[in-house]
């Protein structure tokens, strides 16, 4: 995934939300709403010089293989399934979260500190919202193509045998 210094971080964050937000995402509808998993999420984690997409789910051991298959299927088809209404919904979610975080002193200071530490520059909330609003459907598709959800590490936590 793109690094924090890469402007594609906005699209990457939105892709993570579309794929695996706790409500209304691809994972939510295919895994949580259907009762196959208790929880299934994906997120973008941008860092200094590197970024990752993190995917996880919680389910019973008897459903683990099926859940992993569905996670992989949804991840693989994300880029081809993106629609304009996905962009409208996620843009609204991300902008609202940024605005709410900006209203709290701790959230505002955390954002300022992270931006300064990682980017060496200050960006106002208005500039941040403009960058979110500037993301297009093609940006989402291009970012998904440049940074596909390829699984490099997979781990499981199983119940202890009795």
Predicted features and spans:
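M16/insulysin-pitrilysin zinc metalloprotease superfamily fold
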Residues: 21-22, 41-101
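Double-stranded RNA-binding/processing signature
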Residues: 9
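Non-catalytic beta-strand/loop surface segments
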Residues: 1-5, 17-65, 107, 129-151, ...
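Short acidic alpha-helix initiation/capping motifs at coil-to-helix transition points
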Residues: 6, 66-69, 118-123
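C-terminal regions of mature proteins
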Residues: 77, 90-162
């Amino acid at each position: 995934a793109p690094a924090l210094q890469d402007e594609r971080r906005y699209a990457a964050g939105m892709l993570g939300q579309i794929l695996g937000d706790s409500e209304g995402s691809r994972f939510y509808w295919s895994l949580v709403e259907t009762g196959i998993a208790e929880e299934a999420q994906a997120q973008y984690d941008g860092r200094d010089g590197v970024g990752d997409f993190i995917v996880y789910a919680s389910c019973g051991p008897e459903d683990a293989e099926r859940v992993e298959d569905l996670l992989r299927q949804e991840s693989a088809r994300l880029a081809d399934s993106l629609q304009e209404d996905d962009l409208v919904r996620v843009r609204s979610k991300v902008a609202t979260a940024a605005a709410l975080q900006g209203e709290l002193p701790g959230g505002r200071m955390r954002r300022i500190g992270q931006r300064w530490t990682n980017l060496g520059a200050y960006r106002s909330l208005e500039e941040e919202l403009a960058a979110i609003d500037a993301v297009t459907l093609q940006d989402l598709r291009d970012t998904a193509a440049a940074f596909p959800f390829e699984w490099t590490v997979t781990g499981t936590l199983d119940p202890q045998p009795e």
